[in-house]
Amino acid sequence: MFRRICKPFILLASTLLLGSVASANPAAPSDSTIALLQKAVTGDWRSAAHKARDQYRHPIETLQFFGLKPDMTVIELQPGGGWYTEILAPVLYAHGHLLEASNPKFADRIKANPAVFGHIGEIIPFDPPKQVRLGAENSADMVLSFRNAHDWLMDSPETLAAVFKSVFDVLKPGGVFGFEEHRAKPFATATESAMALHRIPEDYLIAVALKTGFRVAGVSEINANPKDPEDINVHRLPPDLSGPAAEHAQMQAIGESDRMTLMFVKP
């Protein structure tokens, strides 16, 4: 399931310019962890629309790749509609701790569905670039970001760097930053890709992670989509289909965006 960073020459260039990129298999999840993930993904609290996206988002495989365990302290960054939250919250309920770094409006979603979201331990005020601190240093086992980084880069490269630094600070040594993002073409101009397409080149994000102090512990193709040409705005693809109706069938045939799935570790 591990992959080249983009193509072999990109891996070589990244290694020469940025330092060694480790590609290590994460520890295999236990049977109990797999059972909890399967129960959460098939839970009746998840809507049919959310479940329909599993074919593109691969939640069980993605969280296994990151090494999620039910006794971890996990911070999810900017959960949006809570697609991953409704999976994470039940898995971490009994023995772990889930914190959501979001704006205060996410509290309304928790109140609306306490049976699922009531297990969340805390909402951390998080509004880059104004608020990026995630908590006490060395306090979290894992931080997760699902398709958020282009928003930080759209604000500025400094905002993206500040978020990475905040994640690094809050993680314990050995802690994991599980990262998924819409992928731009290799060596595309990062800021322009973020602004126009809501995508970022993979080599750019790896460079930011290494500069922050992370090592790259794993790179996976779990969420890759070779049908995606990587040169169109991701919102034209499912599920948004924001373009004209005449192109919807074409976009549906492509599926959701091609996405990088990276595992960064704090030494």
Where are these regions (language model features)?
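Class I SAM-dependent methyltransferase Rossmann-like catalytic core
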Residues: 33-70
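Conserved class I S-adenosyl-L-methionine
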Residues: 70-80
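Conserved SAM-binding loop of SAM-dependent methyltransferases across substrates and taxa
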Residues: 81-93
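A short glycine-rich, Lys/Arg-flanked "PGG" loop and its adjoining helix->strand segment in the class I
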Residues: 89-90, 158-173
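A short acidic, Gly/Pro-enriched loop at the edge of an enzyme's catalytic core
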Residues: 132-144
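Conserved beta-strand signature within the Rossmann-like core of class I S-adenosyl-L-methionine
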Residues: 174-181
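Conserved Class I S-adenosyl-L-methionine
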Residues: 190-217
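C-terminal lobe and adjacent flexible extensions of AdoMet/dcAdoMet transferase-like proteins
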Residues: 251-267
